Amino acid sequence: MKLTARRQARELALQVLFQTEFAPQISYQTFLEVFEQSLDPEVITYADLIVTGVKSNKEAIDSKIQASSAHWKVERMATIDRNILRIAVYEMRFAADPIKENIAINEAVEIAKKYGTSDSGSFVNGLLDQVGKAH
């Protein structure tokens, strides 16, 4: 899968995770179905893998994030930042085929710059760096 397809999948996974936090009564598959006609099937498949992985490992992922965050509780982090962190930690630590930390961190930072606040990129970078060092 090309990097751009993976980036699209991560961005889609972020959108789905974000939406399901505000509408937990709607299944995440419903949100993915909205994009099925407009995106490459491999993007949908990888996004589904990420969302499923994050949801299945949410407690352990949040525990790793919390252990690396000296000043922020996971539930108090901005929803976008929290879900970007979850995606990156899933891909680094919980995926069946984990990706390299530097790739996960770079992807997360770029997505944070695109979707988060002006501080999101540096926040995500610093926290994921701590997650990497804690491993």
Curated annotation (Swiss-Prot):
Any one GO BP annotation for this protein: DNA-templated transcription termination
Assigned keywords, A-Z: RNA-binding, Transcription, Transcription antitermination, Transcription regulation
Domain of life: Bacteria
GO molecular function annotation: RNA binding
InterPro entries the record matches: NusB-like_sf (IPR035926), NusB_fam (IPR011605), NusB_RsmB_TIM44 (IPR006027)
One GO CC annotation: cytosol
Family: Belongs to the NusB family.
Job description of the protein: Involved in transcription antitermination. Required for transcription of ribosomal RNA (rRNA) genes. Binds specifically to the boxA antiterminator sequence of the ribosomal RNA (rrn) operons.
PANTHER family reported in the protein's UniProt record: ANTITERMINATION NUSB DOMAIN-CONTAINING PROTEIN, N UTILIZATION SUBSTANCE PROTEIN B-RELATED
Protein name, per record: Transcription antitermination protein NusB
Organism: Bdellovibrio bacteriovorus (strain ATCC 15356 / DSM 50701 / NCIMB 9529 / HD100)
The organism's taxonomic lineage, starting at the top: Bacteria, Pseudomonadati, Bdellovibrionota, Bdellovibrionia, Bdellovibrionales
